[in-house]
């Protein structure tokens, strides 16, 4: 299990991402449309004034059962350990162990 504080930090980042996503996208689109260098520099400084945690890159995909941050399958939201456990116990519908 991951520490509760680490999981909570990720949740807080998700809230910030949702809060500032429209503002961040508007600035990015303006940067793409602008050809003047001075204007682009000022727009980049506007992006840098936004909170760091409002960037999507800082969000970590975590297992919804254990909170593990590494080796998480996006389609299921599970770490490899929980995926194997749940699939072998038949808790994931449609997942079948392959054999050939």
Curated annotation (Swiss-Prot):
Bilayer-crossing residues are: none
Keywords from UniProt, A to Z, are: Chloroplast, Plastid, Ribonucleoprotein, Ribosomal protein, RNA-binding, rRNA-binding
* UniProt-listed SUPFAM superfamilies: Glucocorticoid receptor-like (DNA-binding domain) (SSF57716)
**GO (cellular component) term, any one:** chloroplast
Which Pfam families does the entry link to?
Answer: Ribosomal_S14 (PF00253)
Molecular function via GO: rRNA binding; structural constituent of ribosome
Q: Name one GO biological process term.
A: translation
Q: List the disulfide bonds.
A: none
- Recorded coiled-coil stretches: none
Judging by the UniProt lineage, the source's domain of life is: Eukaryota
What PROSITE patterns does this protein map onto?
RIBOSOMAL_S14
The protein's role, per its UniProt record: Binds 16S rRNA, required for the assembly of 30S particles.
Subunit relationships: Part of the 30S ribosomal subunit.
Concerning its family, UniProt says:
Belongs to the universal ribosomal protein uS14 family.
Name-wise, this protein is Small ribosomal subunit protein uS14c
> Organism, per UniProt?
Cyanidium caldarium (Red alga)
């Amino acid at each position: 299990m991951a520490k509760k504080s680490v999981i909570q930090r990720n949740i807080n980042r998700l809230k910030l991402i949702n809060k500032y996503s429209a503002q961040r996208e508007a600035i990015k689109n303006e940067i793409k449309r602008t050809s003047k260098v001075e204007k682009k520099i000022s727009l980049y400084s506007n992006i840098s004034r936004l909170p760091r945690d409002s960037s999507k890159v800082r969000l970590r995909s975590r297992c919804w059962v254990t909170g593990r941050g590494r080796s998480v399958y996006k389609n299921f939201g599970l770490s490899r350990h929980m995926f194997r456990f749940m699939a072998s116990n038949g808790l994931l519908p449609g997942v079948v162990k392959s054999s050939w």
